[in-house]
C-alpha cells in the first residue's frame, strides 16, 4: 500500500524526527500546503470557501490558516487516491507507529476510511476489542483511505 507522509517543506526537522521514530517505514513525502501563504481569493478560485464566523465547538477558536492548509493537504491526497484508484496510508509527520503496526494485516480490512491515530475529544465506541468507532475524532494524524 502506498504510504504518504505530509510534511511542510520548511520543516525538515519534523521529517528527521519522523524517520527516527519510524525507521523501517517506506514512504513518499507529500509536500504540505502552507495555509498562511494562501489568500482567500485563491481558495475561492479553487472552489473553496470558508465560514469566517465558524468556531470550533470543542476548542472555541476560529479556523486558522494552518488548519486550512492542513485540510487542503489531505484533500489533495484524497483526490490522488481517487485518481490513482488505489488505497493510501496517510501519516502526518508527527505520527509514531508502534512495533505492532502491521500494514499488511490492516490493509486486509474492509473499509473506506480507517482512523489509525487521532486526538480523542469524546469517548470512543468499542467495536470488537481491537477496533473502536471514534465519536468526535480530532486531528488526522494517521489513517487509511480507499478510493471507494
Regions found by a protein language model. Name each.
Residues 1-91, 95-148:
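An acidic/histidine-cluster motif and surrounding catalytic segment
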Amino acid at each position: 500500500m502506498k504510504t504518504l507522509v505530509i510534511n511542510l517543506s520548511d520543516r525538515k526537522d519534523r521529517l528527521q524526527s519522523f524517520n527516527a521514530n519510524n525507521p523501517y517505514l517506506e514512504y513518499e513525502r507529500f509536500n504540505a500546503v502552507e495555509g498562511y501563504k494562501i489568500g482567500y481569493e485563491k481558495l475561492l478560485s479553487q472552489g473553496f470557501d470558508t465560514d469566517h464566523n465558524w468556531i470550533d465547538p470543542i476548542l472555541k477558536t476560529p479556523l486558522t490558516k494552518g488548519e486550512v492548509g492542513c485540510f487542503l493537504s489531505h484533500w489533495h491526497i484524497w483526490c490522488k487516491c481517487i485518481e490513482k484508484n488505489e488505497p493510501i496510508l496517510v501519516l502526518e509527520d508527527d505520527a509514531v507507529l508502534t512495533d505492532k503496526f502491521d500494514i499488511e494485516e490492516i490493509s486486509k480490512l474492509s473499509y473506506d476510511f480507517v482512523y489509525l491515530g487521532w486526538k480523542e475529544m469524546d469517548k470512543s465506541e468499542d467495536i470488537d476489542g481491537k477496533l473502536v468507532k471514534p465519536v468526535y475524532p480530532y486531528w488526522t494524524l494517521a489513517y487509511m483511505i480507499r478510493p471507494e
